[in-house]
Amino acid sequence: MSAADYQRPHYAPGVPAVVALPTQPLSTVLDDAAKRFPQRIAVDFLGTNITYAQLHTQVQRAAEALRRLGVRKGDVVASILPNCPQHLVLAYATWRIGAVLAEHNPLAPSSQIEEQLKLHGGKLIIGWEKSLAQLDKDINLRDYNVYAVNMTSALPRHLQAALRLPVKAARAKREEMRAPVPSWIGSWDRLVASSPALPADTALPDVNDVATLLHTGGTTGTPKAVKLTHMNLGSNTAMGLAWAGPHVKDGQEVFYSVLPYFHAFGLTLSMLCAVALAATQVVLPKFSVSLVIEAWKRQPCTF
């Protein structure tokens, strides 16, 4: 049966009824964007700008850091992060080496995260300092290999300096973004910064390999870890771009990435579709009217 037999008259003009299945793993989405638009701003994080070339370099370093930690194809890497540049880098690095990214809500109760960790069996955790500080109080994190993300390390230098000021407003903002973690927990930011790039000849995963585990809400039963392959997520990306296709242009769009990366919608729309378009992502760790207004002054959104 041909694609013409699947035409949908209720679809918008120009939207195909059938899209081609992806033949390459998810990490190649970023590879392609970095080749086509290396100097395009990939990420705006509260004023910090990261180009696609820089993002690609960070991903290659993070991939090698994971490999040197012993992560191999099929191993699970637990991400307990809000939207931030480190989250984006970790995802593409994990996919690049064929490992599986298990997404967790960083604001979820410790008991829920503990059950999810047991469910997928991953032993490496990359987490936000505030999430790890709470988890360390509630569960035995020493059963895992744990690295902390300092979200303020991705801020512009002037904002980092402002957070160190001995004033109430700076202290409140610092406490909102950071928390002290035990000394045995490593620094993910420092590890990636000191790592060389992944060897270029490192084998890519197959499109049918599992790429991500997303956890269901458990509304109708026990929460489950849903296995999503590179094919699953690549197909979702292709379909999303097919619907948006007549209205977006490669290398010209600005997405406001406020939908959580750890949810299917945010992962597909922002982490994948935006990168496939070589769009600029204004990455927002949470929704805030003031954050959006400030972002609009820097980068008015198109999507």
Regions found by a protein language model. Give the residues of each.
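A short helix-loop-beta submotif of the ANL/AMP-binding
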Residues: 63, 76, 82-102, 106-110, ...
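Conserved S/T- and glycine-rich ATP-binding loop of Class I adenylate-forming
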Residues: 77, 94, 125, 210, ...
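Alpha-helix-centered segments that form part of catalytic cores
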Residues: 23, 175-207
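Conserved adenylate-forming
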Residues: 66-72, 195-208, 213-257, 277-281
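Conserved AMP-binding/adenylation subdomain of ANL enzymes
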Residues: 234-254, 262-303
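Flexible, non-catalytic linker and terminal segments flanking ANL/adenylate-forming cores
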Residues: 1-23
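Structural core segment of the AMP-binding/adenylate-forming
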Residues: 68-69, 96-190
